[in-house]
Amino acid sequence: MLVPLSPLARTVVVALTIASGWTGVTLTLRAQQSGSRPMTFLDMQQMRQVGSPTPSPDGRWLLYTLSTPDWTEAKRQTDLYLVSIQQGVASTRQLTFSKEKNETSPRWARDGSSFLFLSNREAPENAASRNQLYQMRPDGGEARRLTDAKEGVSDFSLSRDGRWVVYRSGKSDEEQLYRLPIAGLDTAVAEAMTKHPTGVRSWQWAPDSKRIYFVTPDSVDLDDKARRDKKFTINIRNPETPVASLWALEVDGPQTTKRLTEGGAFSVDDVTVSSDSKWIGLRGLSPDRYKRGITSENIYGDLYLIDATTGAVERLTTNAEIGESPISFSPDSKSFAFSGPDDLQTYGMSNNRVYVRAIADRGKPFQKRGETFDGDVSVGFWSKDSATIYFNEGIRATNQIVSLDVRYNTVRPLTEEKAAVSIDRDEDTGVLLIDYSDGTTASTLFTVDAIANVSTRASWRQLTDPNPQVRAFALGQQEEITWRSKDGTTVGGVLVKPVGYRAGQRYPLIVAIHGGPASADILSFNGGYGSQVYAGAGYVVLRPNYRGSTNYGHKLKTDIVGNYMAPGYDDIMAGVDHLSAQGIADPARMGALGWSAGGHWSNWILTHTDRFKAISTGAGTMNWISLYAQSDVQRNRQYYLGNKLPYDDFDAYWNQSPLKYIKNAKTPTMIHVVEGDPRVPSPQSIELHMALKQLGVPSELYMYPGNTHGIPDPRNQFVKSVSEMAWMDFYVRGQGTKFAWRDVLKTLEDEAARPKVVTEQDAKR
């Protein structure tokens, strides 16, 4: 009989057996039977990521970045790769080999003879992250540096007419635009295009290459800048800041600039330009200091349309607390569209619809599209004839590619994959790129020749294979399931069975609760906080899409409004009972875990039942009254909890607070939070830990450095995952010794012997 190992022991043993070439009886019996090994948390840290896919102007080649993690050093290293779009993944070539440095943001020259990119390969040690601009040929050879910007290059873009590359550089809040002629890159000296006193915050080319539009603050507070330079780094909440305006820079001639928005009525954001360069769409944010520069600033903005020739401004929306999407122009530049709530006047969680109008129909009402679809309708990209809009949308436990016929107002899913599928199109070349992930396939990029062929998997061509090591993992079977909740509501979710699952045998259960709550668990690879690692260790994992989740229609998403916690709790517990009734889960061995909203419901479970043997809660609330002021978002809390301010209805907030019921807590609970979390600040977790400590309930509080809602450091992500699983093993299965730092330190030592991920293309070189 084999004794299951602790989470760290599993990780270390797998690493050592691979490094030595020995794969004996140290793996679990289930993994031996499948001829593979279970997935570990170290494997999760080693997953490589594809980014910045960029087709060549002739549509024959694809440049992309491949990011390789080094979790022991808490960093990632990025190189550039090239693949033939017609030949597919077998033709992949690595173009850069910078080891400790990075190459990012590849962009093709318009004639396809070379490409440009950013890199810190020659950056000094005291400015290691500072990028410069480089040029390289796709057929190989050494890259050539084009810039020597003192402060580095922030970003760059090439004009569509192929004449110029423009980049942004300078000190923070003082960045300016510079240009180099493509025809003379060998000897060219950068020419300053702007000398704006407040710098350039964001910018983009007009498609006709005659103008550059940039956004910049109206003024600079020199005293505020001086105090920061003098290290008076006090953080002032909602400081007075200048609004930002839109400017036009003429590329040819004397390079004059012209201000297009003024008066302080709004602050410019999310600028888009029509393909004929005659129209500009933008979001105007509120000038109110308390409604701008905050996480939810978009809901206080409105959309505007500007005539690029005359400068005439048309306000398109006039509503409070509605966050429309940016404007998207049709390819023929005759119409525009944006997405927003079904009720375009009232804040809420109603399904998004698409609103369309001809540009010439100034002042006329929008045409609402997609009303009959019980899900969100959005604007991804238009068909070439401007008749159809394509977008990606969650449908039950999947993500699919969907079309909206603008003229006939019909919505139709184009794919029916038991997977996570999304599509994007390169606007210059029309190349279609599909991202695909399922229970056994990590995120992989494909292409298809025409949108009409998207529904036929056989017509897809694979372009990337960033994580071939996944094929060696013993993975649990993943499937979508449904069950009936306490009130008869049909609820869905994802079930991950243990590796080597045998019908009729009961397994320890982990309930992995997603955040949001306006989100959903889908049939992608290794979702649910590492569900495949738990499956490899002998657990069955339930990832419930409880009420409040997306993908299952408007009613399920909004059923928690005014009664936030109870319906979702009922759904989760009914799912647990369903698995027990099916003979899959052992009701005597159950644990629950979650982050953010998943932490909220973990805390509610803690204070409403003792059926679970262990809980691990991350960034969860305890007291909605105090969280309202502590958090960086307020309006959605108010909406969910009855649509009143807490000061007008304390009971509505308190009745939904786990702290009110804390004396019911009996379950050993591990707590995780980032110290500077802005969304669910750490005092919520500290409050829970103190209460459990005083009530005599076993508890551990892990506080991670950082100022983000998620754990930023890969090393600490690893610690969180391993300590969490050790907590489950100890209390749910009665195994192991909880968490030991010595094991983590040993893992760091053993990682040096662990072979790096090698793709087939790497091996060929």
Task: Put a short name on every predicted segment.
Residues R502-Y507, A512-Y552:
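Short substrate-entry loop that stabilizes the transition state in hydrolases
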Residues I85-G88, R137-G141, P181-D186, E250-P254, ...:
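Short loop/turn segments that connect beta-strands within beta-propeller blades
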Residues Q33-A74:
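Mature N-terminal segment immediately following signal peptide/propeptide cleavage
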Residues T54, I212-T216, L222-D224, N238-L246, ...:
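Non-catalytic accessory segments flanking enzyme active sites
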